[in-house]
Amino acid sequence: MPWLTVSGLDLGSVVTSTWHLLLLGAASWILARILAWTYSFCENCSRLRCFPQSPKRNWFLGHLGTIQSNEEGMRLVTEMGQTFRDIHLCWLGPVIPVLRLVDPAFVAPLLQAPALVAPKDTTFLRFLKPWLGDGLFLSSGDKWSRHRRLLTPAFHFDILKPYVKIFNQSVNIMHAKWKHLCLEGSARLEMFENISLMTLDSLQKCLFGFDSNCQESPSEYISAILELSSLIIKRSQQLFLYLDFLYYRTADGRRFRKACDLVHNFTDAVIRERRRLLSSQGTDEFLESKTKSKSKTLDFIDVLLLAKDEHGKELSDEDIRAEADTFMFGGHDTTASALSWILYNLARHPEYQERCRQEVWELLRDREPEEIEWDDLAQLPFLTMCIKESLRLHPPAIDLLRRCTQDIVLPDGRVIPKGNICVISIFGIHHNPSVWPDPEVFDPFRFDSENRQKRSPLSFIPFSAGPRNCIGQTFAMNEMKVVVALTLLRFRVLPDDKEPRRKPEIILRAEGGLWLRMEPLSTDTQ
């Protein structure tokens, strides 16, 4: 019948109509998302108008490229801190606003907030994830809180005390190399390279109880650590390689994977062996064997293996590896940067260098061998003041990134809207003339007890502050005191003819290295 033919719709037409409806629905959904994002963006821009900003390069780039990773960029950061003395707005391209804070009172709501309110922004840290995993540096939320609680005992005084002997041993090896080079006429030394190897040597001994002899002969593991750090810096400077599927198809990406595998395999092997020992010996016998060992100390790995939360649950091998790799990453470059700049500042101020040297001489008078002990660390007040003043002038990490998960109210009543990225400028705070008079002058007396009481605790934050402060800061300060004290005892540190140009990367470096001249001191001089 004809009407049956007419009503029997063509199957192709039905399919076409269905696809049209699906496409229309998808287009409507996309349009709705675009409109919602546009509304949210415009509302956010409106709320950010209360914050001052410097002129943009143009509408598309925003402030990208204004502050470069070189000496001129560092000077511009200082100038901006003098112009905007609390907070100002920058734009990364046309749509990414970033608030930069340079005043202690203004960073307080961020640094003192619970970790969930102002977690780290991982936009520029995700390159580290394949290497460091979910260690303290990159994790967040409940996992971070649990790991922080479990790792805190690893940095207790009882654990840190025996490490001082390890610091002495490592710096003695470095100084022996320096004296040999000086005898050969090579008194001009690059600090970062030498000190990085020394800090890695110490870390490997404290972390794994393993002596790689890396300061005197090549170590595959140490070479991989150094290569990973170098490759991450290189990748961060190439925007088109931010995408993983592109990066891992490059030669650098393949080298990064290979170095990651090598580091992970080494750490995994140590964990497996320690867990086997712990399982076969039992906790009591394992601890007793440690006290009878030559080092008489628990390594960092041992503490993590023994750690249990309130429910009696241990860290997994993957968790332990992540924390061990994080400790290696966070403990070698930052301390090497700090030590290099400390020696540079003392070289430029021989009067302070000499006063530090006299303090060390008095402390170690008639002591054989010349070794800094645990109790000595509290007996070096002026040297400690010089270390802190150098950390103020040249903080190893110049910025902290936070992303607000809720509105943050500032002291003057202005509000940082939820979802925005904040840069807590450690360098900006440390060079803010409202906080530090004559901020470019090296003056250790800023840190005497009287002056210290006049300032906010957040005016000096080389190790960050608040819930997410650096868990290893006491370890780092102890190592710095040992290295600086013994270096000044054995060498006169002199500035190079060429003034270094600062270069901020993951840590604060110097273009072409930081070069100083070392003059060995004779026993008679001492």
From Swiss-Prot:
It is a peripheral membrane protein. InterPro entries: Cyt_P450, Cyt_P450_CS, Cyt_P450_E_grp-IV, Cyt_P450_sf, Cytochrome_P450_Monoox. It is found in: Endoplasmic reticulum membrane; Microsome membrane. It comes from the Eukaryota. GO terms for cellular component: endoplasmic reticulum membrane. Its main location: endoplasmic reticulum. One of its GO terms (biological process) is response to 3-methylcholanthrene. Signal peptide: none annotated. Heme binds at residue 470. Gene3D superfamilies: Cytochrome P450. Its EC number is 1.14.14.1. High expression in liver and kidney. Lower expression in brain. It catalyses: an organic molecule + reduced [NADPH--hemoprotein reductase] + O2 = an alcohol + oxidized [NADPH--hemoprotein reductase] + H2O + H(+). Its cofactor is heme. One of its GO terms (molecular function) is iron ion binding. Keywords: Endoplasmic reticulum, Heme, Iron, Membrane, Metal-binding, Microsome, Monooxygenase, Oxidoreductase. PANTHER family: CYTOCHROME P450 CYP4F16-RELATED, CYTOCHROME P450 FAMILY 4. Belongs to the cytochrome P450 family. This is Cytochrome P450 4F5.
